[in-house]
Amino acid sequence: MIKRICFLLSLLMCGVLYAQDITYRTVKDLSYSSSKDPYATERCKLDVYYPENKTGCPVVVWFHGGGLTQGNKSIPGRLKKNGMVVIAVNYRLLPKVAISECLDDAAASVAWAFREVEKYGGDKNKIFISGHSAGGYLTAMVGLDKRWLKKYDIDADSIAGLIPFSGQVISHFSYRKMNGIDNLQPTVDEFAPLFHVRKDAPPLVLITGDRELELSDVMKRMRICGG
């Protein structure tokens, strides 16, 4: 599944699919947070995979899945050798931190991309945010709820596109569990992407299975508000 969706993402990025003759480099474990907290120092790191001696490349910031409770950064194989800069992000995990800190880490890493990606040949006007499962949830929240990036003086509308794969759009199940909410009780509060649907959001591609019925509500609300 993850291979198929990454292949689709590479198609969505358009125009660079056959850039196979380019040399690529990977820089690992760059810190994107100024926090001195030991857990933040451990987890708030990212890897940058980039084509050497190229400029103006599209950029994908990729968040891993794992229910917000596990997982580690990696560069999806199907995103490699496509002429893109790919930034794979680690973030702090529940239950060691609150969900607000997971979201703050996601925003901080995106802000880092806007500040630093040109050093690696990326175009800050072509930054796409993506991720699978929990990573898809973070993608949608950071792009739709503008307060997270505003903290870092970044307008979320500057994101070129949001491409969440199977990300929850109601409040995340791990967050609900931590707060004593029944797993089968759908909740839409300030930690639900659905709560933050807005007309002026970045372009949004929703890729999901047919069991995730709430995704259709996102599209319905986007159409109603004119997004």
Predicted feature locations:
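Short amphipathic alpha-helix adjacent to the substrate-entry channel of hydrolases
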Residues: N72-V89
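Alpha/beta-hydrolase active-site loop
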Residues: V97-E118, M141
